[in-house]
């Protein structure tokens, strides 16, 4: 199969500023899933944080196929500081102020409307929280989208406490 052109673009989510735009030649594309790796440098990109939730759109176009994904540049890690485990967001220590979200939604009991999802995130921010926990539930995409937009971290509790830890070990 001959090479095709792929256009890769990174731009501000709610702006017009384009941080990166380049056309690549991709070969051996087949029907179904294809994986390609590209390393790009974006020195003008701003990090996402709970105080400044900068978001970007990554767009990929090959022929008539287009895909766009919103994202933020961030990394979360746990560091050992003199025997004390501490959380870091983008290399800076963060103290997590959180509460449980039971995800009981009055409209239907299963999934939140966009209005309720946004209200939950806004309420958490007004209370001074920087994180919520999805408790005994899987996070809904509209809740996570608003959390990204408004600067709120989410933790999804893994559940499964009915099984002993040995059930998950490879040994």
Residue spans for each PLM region:
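Active-site-adjacent "subsite" loops/lids of carbohydrate-active enzymes
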Residues: 97, 161-171
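Solvent-exposed loop/turn segments at secondary-structure junctions
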Residues: 138-140, 160-163
């Amino acid at each position: 199969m001959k090479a095709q052109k792929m256009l890769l673009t990174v731009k501000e989510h709610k702006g017009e500023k384009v941080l990166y735009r380049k056309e690549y030649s991709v070969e051996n594309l087949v029907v179904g899933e294809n994986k390609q790796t590209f390393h790009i440098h974006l020195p003008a990109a701003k990090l996402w944080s709970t105080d400044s939730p900068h978001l970007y759109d990554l767009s990929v176009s090959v022929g008539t196929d287009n895909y766009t994904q919103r994202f933020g540049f961030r990394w979360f890690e746990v560091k050992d500081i003199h025997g004390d485990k501490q959380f870091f967001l983008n290399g800076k220590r963060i103290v997590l102020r959180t509460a449980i979200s039971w995800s009981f939604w009055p409209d239907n009991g299963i999934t939140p409307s966009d209005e309720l999802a946004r209200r939950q995130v806004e309420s958490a921010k007004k209370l001074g929280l920087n994180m919520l926990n999805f408790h005994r539930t899987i996070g809904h995409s509209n809740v996570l989208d608003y959390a990204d937009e408004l600067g709120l971290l989410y933790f999804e509790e893994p559940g499964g406490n009915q099984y002993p830890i040995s059930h998950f070990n490879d040994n």
